[in-house]
């Protein structure tokens, strides 16, 4: 089967939620946070690919790639749009001061893992002045992760493994660029855990194929389906 980071993460959080989304075809409706985040990602990709590094070009990209769905009304959409303009204006100033060179933007990868295929999409890989590579993931939440949270997060390690196995790029640094918070958190990448991560990705894919979808109620309080799931463990 084909497994992405999203499928892997959701299955490891709660196999029953995985079943809801990827077997039963349930959908999570867009909301203002998800629409804002995707709009900012799309604008950054368009701008970085354009070759025009001006602020006007970045704001033009935001207008062109803005997603209008998910907002309760036009007033709310206008507030979120103004926030996106502020966020990207600040990002532009920070980006212009960096000396790194992007070598990959929204780069898709696939690589074989036994009988499975691992697929993913990397926001950005930069080559730094010393020749090393930095893998960057954009986040649009209000708070940047702490260094400890970054160390515990499997997403960037999943992407770093994909960069090496599929693209032949061995990254030295993992970075979360919290665009909304205006902060970057980085750590050196240690590839020593790649074998264990690959084994767990493969094990998750095996379990999915075998139809093992038992619920894990630890994540119920923040689940999108907590109000209509028979297994939800939510205090009244």
Regions found by a protein language model. Give the residues of each.
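A non-catalytic, helix-rich entry segment at domain boundaries
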Residues: 42-108, 112
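Metal-dependent nuclease catalytic regions and adjoining charged, substrate-binding loops involved
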Residues: 2, 130, 161-236
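Short acidic (Asp/Glu) and glycine-rich catalytic loops that position anionic groups and cofactors
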Residues: 17-22, 41-42, 64, 136-140, ...
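Short, polar/flexible loop-turn hinges at active-site or ligand-entry regions and domain interfaces
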Residues: 25-33, 51-53, 145-146, 213
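C-terminal, charged and often intrinsically disordered regions of DNA end-processing helicases
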Residues: 1-34
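Non-catalytic protein-protein interaction segments used by genome-maintenance enzymes to assemble
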Residues: 104-160, 197
């Amino acid at each position: 089967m084909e497994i992405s980071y999203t499928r892997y993460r959701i299955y490891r959080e709660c196999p029953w939620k995985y079943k809801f989304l990827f077997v039963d075809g349930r959908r999570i409706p867009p909301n203002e946070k998800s629409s804002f985040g995707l709009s900012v990602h799309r604008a950054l990709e368009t701008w970085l690919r354009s070759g025009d590094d001006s602020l006007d070009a970045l704001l033009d990209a935001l207008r062109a790639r803005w997603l209008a769905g998910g907002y309760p009304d036009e007033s709310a959409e206008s507030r979120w749009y103004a926030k996106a303009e502020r966020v990207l204006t600040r990002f532009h100033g920070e980006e212009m001061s960096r000396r790194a060179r992007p070598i990959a933007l929204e780069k898709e990868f696939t690589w074989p893992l036994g009988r499975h295929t691992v697929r993913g999409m990397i926001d950005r890989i930069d080559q730094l002045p010393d020749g090393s590579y930095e893998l960057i993931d954009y986040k649009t939440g209000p708070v940047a992760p702490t260094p400890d949270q970054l160390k515990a997060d499997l997403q960037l390690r999943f992407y770093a493994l994909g960069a090496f196995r599929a693209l032949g790029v061995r990254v030295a640094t993992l970075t979360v660029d919290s665009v909304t918070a205006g902060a970057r958190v980085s750590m050196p990448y240690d590839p020593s855990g790649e074998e264990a991560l690959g084994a767990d990705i493969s094990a998750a894919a095996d379990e999915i194929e075998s139809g093992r979808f038992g619920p894990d109620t630890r994540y119920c309080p923040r689940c999108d389906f907590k109000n209509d799931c028979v297994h939800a463990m939510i205090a009244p």
